[in-house]
């Protein structure tokens, strides 16, 4: 239990501090029951650009479920493995959607090539940036930049590789870098649920508190009551919640023993 808790703490730390979690819920449907909820991200993105004194970046926090193929490598045939503490140590790459500010929000730096760009989002470019572990598993010693991945049959060009965040000998931390990040507009071809979760990266803890107040006020005027709701809070809320959960489980198991 302590091993799993320590590993999760390391993973939270690797994503960086001063992150704000934004959730926007909407329940608007037409007469046929189709979801016609508004996409709030463009408005939220533009608003956060005006908060540069406090905010470094903003990105959707969502993922895709797709098969990735390069040569003989196929994500659908990769086996998921866990260590004795039930930490994920190997498996297929995780697939994420992001804005041009995804790396800033997740404590990532580009080691090769380039990052996602604003025009990639606007022009629906079929490009991606991959993590260091994904590059190793799919490409070995070959430079991935410029290579093409097949993702559910669609071509996506690798434009960059993120530097490793995990230790070389820590398989669970390396798994954090086993990932592919697509422009969030790629969801039109790869699918996935409508975005409801977003991450805002603040400059420091004081700026995070200020951003929470400003963004909350902005969303109050943007999300109509009766057909939607929102929540803005420090992203380490989940870290605190996990710590409390692990402590409670430990107390229960200790009582049983």
Question: What annotation goes with each model-predicted range?
Answer:
Residues 4, 199-203, 209-215, 221-257:
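Peri-transmembrane interface segments
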Residues 8, 43-44, 183, 241, ...:
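Hydrophobic alpha-helical segments typical of transmembrane helices
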Residues 19-21, 57, 115, 148, ...:
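Residues at or immediately flanking beta-strands
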Residues 40-44, 99-102, 211, 245:
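Stable alpha-helical elements in mature extracytoplasmic
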């Amino acid at each position: 239990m302590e091993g799993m808790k320590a590993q999760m703490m390391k993973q939270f730390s690797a994503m960086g501090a001063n992150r704000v979690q934004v959730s926007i819920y909407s329940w608007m449907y037409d007469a046929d029951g189709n979801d016609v909820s508004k996409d709030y991200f463009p408005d939220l993105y533009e608003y956060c650009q005006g908060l540069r004194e406090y905010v470094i970046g903003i990105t959707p926090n969502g993922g895709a479920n797709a098969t990735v193929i390069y040569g003989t490598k196929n994500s659908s045939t990769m086996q998921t493995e866990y260590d004795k503490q039930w930490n994920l140590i190997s498996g297929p790459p995780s697939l994420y959607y992001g804005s041009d500010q995804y790396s800033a929000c997740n404590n990532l730096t580009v080691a090769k090539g380039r990052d996602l760009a604003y025009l990639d989002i606007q022009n629906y470019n079929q490009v991606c940036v991959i993590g260091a572990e994904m590059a190793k598993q799919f490409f070995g010693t070959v430079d991935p930049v410029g290579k093409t991945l097949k993702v559910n049959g669609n071509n996506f060009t690798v434009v960059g590789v993120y530097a490793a965040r995990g230790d070389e000998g820590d398989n669970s931390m390396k798994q954090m870098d086993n990932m592919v990040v697509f422009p969030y507009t790629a969801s039109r071809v790869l699918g996935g649920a409508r975005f409801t979760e977003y991450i805002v990266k603040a400059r420091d803890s004081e700026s995070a508190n200020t951003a929470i107040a400003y963004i909350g006020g902005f969303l109050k005027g943007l999300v109509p009551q009766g057909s939607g709701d929102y929540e803005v809070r420090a992203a380490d809320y989940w870290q605190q919640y996990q710590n409390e959960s692990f402590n409670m489980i430990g107390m229960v198991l200790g009582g049983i023993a």
